[in-house]
Each structure stands twice: as C-alpha cells, then as structure tokens.
Amino acid sequence: MNDAAPMSPAEFEQALRAKGAFYHIHHPYHVAMYEGRATREQIQGWVANRFYYQVNIPMKDAAILANCPDREVRREWVQRLLDHDGAPGEDGGIEAWLRLGQAVGLDPDQLRSQELVLPGVRFAVDAYVNFARRASWQEAASSSLTELFAPQIHQSRLDSWPQHYPWIDPAGYEYFRTRLGQARRDVEHGLAITLAHYTTREGQARMLEILQFKLDILWSMLDAMSMAYELNRPPYHSVTSERVWHKGIAL
C-alpha cells in the first residue's frame, strides 16, 4: 500500500505528459520516415500494419462503452467510434486510411485482407483490445492518453512526407489532417476522466504504468516492422521467403 500523498492534478498531468519521452515518434523507424530515409517498402509496410491498429480502435472503444455505466461519458465517447467507422452515409478514419494505402501504392483489398500484418503487430494490437475489454472503463479510457502526443506525430508527417516522398498521392494525407483536431478533442475528454478518477498516489502510479503499457504497444509494433522492413528479417526469414504466418484466428 502506498501511503504517499497523491500528486495534485497539475503534478499528475505533468507526470503523464512526461511519458511523451517514450512515445513512438522517437522510434528509429518513425525518425527514418520523418527524415526521408524510409524506402517505399518501409512506408508501405508501416501503412499496411498500422491498418490493423486502425480497424481495432473501434473495437477498443466499443469495449469501453460496454463497460461504462455513465450515460454522459458514453454519449461523448461514442464519437470516437463514429470518427473511425464513420457515421451513416459518411466515411470515417478507416476509409481515410484505405485511401492512404492507395496513395502509397497498396491495394485496398490487400489491406482489408490483413495478409501483410506481422505477428508482432497483431499481438500488440490484440493485447490492447483485450486490455480494454478486461480493465475498468476508466482504466481503458485513460490508456488512450497517448493521444496527448498524437498531434505532434500527425503534424510531423504532414510537414515532412510531401517533401521527402513525392511519389505519395497528397490525397492520402487526409487522415492525418483530420486526426489533428480529433485527437486534441479526445485528449480533453480522456484527460478529464483520468484526473478525476486517479486521486490516490497508488492509483496515479497504476495509471502511469497503464500509459507505459500503451507506449510499449506502439513501440513494439515498430520493433516488429524494423525487423521485417529495415533488417530484412521478417518471421521465418531463415527458412522461407513466403509470408507463412497466421492471418488472424477468429474466436
């Protein structure tokens, strides 16, 4: 039991923001993309693997809604599902990501098939969705606070990719532009929930560990991509050049 006095809301927020030092914007794979050193294959591999993350975000948010008894929270949180899945008659973030895939030369059907998703990426994303299903709704909601750092990473792509990768169709950048505003809005709500819920030192320490868990997920995804697309050591590379890994097991 931790009997230390809790951090004030301002101190707690500062501790949360300090975790940005471990955000995946600092991963060598992302740095290479930002600095224009990534190959076409590396860009395509990143887009294809991140698509698995994109299609699972609504599943994560649906789990939070299912576990949340607070109607007012649900009313606001449901916007996240609409952002990704799209409102009736409107496209959402998933369609925008498919257009990004087309912009970098990938076929939308291939993206949807998830055949390019590396096992390490799949395991990381699945761990996040399963956490959201099993944790309290407050803990699952607060795990989204890597969004504190998201506007910077979206802006970095908008600032650097058009210059370094003229072969990418600019229409594909719609997702990043849209998420700039959405992420800032989502941060306000997620941060309010987090600061209100974690009022003991023990709870605050747990939340910082939850945020680190989410940072680990994002970093591990890029580690898997580095092995496959930078070091040319995808799964089973020593025994076959074929993509023999599983494509997802429906349960």
Swiss-Prot record:
<dbReference type="InterPro" id="IPR016084">
    <property type="entry name" value="Haem_Oase-like_multi-hlx"/>
</dbReference>
<dbReference type="GO" id="GO:0033732">
    <property type="term" value="F:pyrroloquinoline-quinone synthase activity"/>
</dbReference>
<dbReference type="Pfam" id="PF03070">
    <property type="entry name" value="TENA_THI-4"/>
</dbReference>
<keyword id="KW-0884">PQQ biosynthesis</keyword>
<dbReference type="InterPro" id="IPR011845">
    <property type="entry name" value="PqqC"/>
</dbReference>
<keyword id="KW-0560">Oxidoreductase</keyword>
<dbReference type="GO" id="GO:0018189">
    <property type="term" value="P:pyrroloquinoline quinone biosynthetic process"/>
</dbReference>
<comment type="similarity">
    <text>Belongs to the PqqC family.</text>
</comment>
<protein>
    <recommendedName>
        <fullName>Pyrroloquinoline-quinone synthase</fullName>
        <ecNumber>1.3.3.11</ecNumber>
    </recommendedName>
</protein>
<comment type="function">
    <text>Ring cyclization and eight-electron oxidation of 3a-(2-amino-2-carboxyethyl)-4,5-dioxo-4,5,6,7,8,9-hexahydroquinoline-7,9-dicarboxylic-acid to PQQ.</text>
</comment>
<comment type="pathway">
    <text>Cofactor biosynthesis; pyrroloquinoline quinone biosynthesis.</text>
</comment>
<dbReference type="InterPro" id="IPR004305">
    <property type="entry name" value="Thiaminase-2/PQQC"/>
</dbReference>
<dbReference type="GO" id="GO:0006790">
    <property type="term" value="P:sulfur compound metabolic process"/>
</dbReference>
<dbReference type="InterPro" id="IPR039068">
    <property type="entry name" value="PqqC-like"/>
</dbReference>
